[in-house]
Amino acid sequence: MGFKTRFRELRESRGLSQAATDEVFGLMRGTCSIWENGFSEPEEELIEDIARFFGVRIHDLVEEA
């Protein structure tokens, strides 16, 4: 499972909408949708923040299964 799938699972497990998640990370509205649809991925520094927020290791967030 790659970033887009794992990110969506983590976001939904917290009961967060895409818009709310954009706000949590200070992103432009629609950014989470772009990630979850696989059009792009966040920069490495932001991936670290996302992993910390969701309480997972970076490896678990970005690695393909």
Predicted regions and their residues:
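DNA major-groove recognition helix of helix-turn-helix/homeodomain DNA-binding modules
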Residues: 26, 45-60
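Short alpha-helical DNA-recognition segment
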Residues: 15-34
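Phosphate-coordinating loops and pocket residues in cytosolic domains that bind phosphorylated ligands
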Residues: 34, 63-64
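A short, Lys/Arg-rich alpha-helix, primarily the initiator
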Residues: 1-15
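The alpha-helix within a helix-turn-helix
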Residues: 11, 22, 51
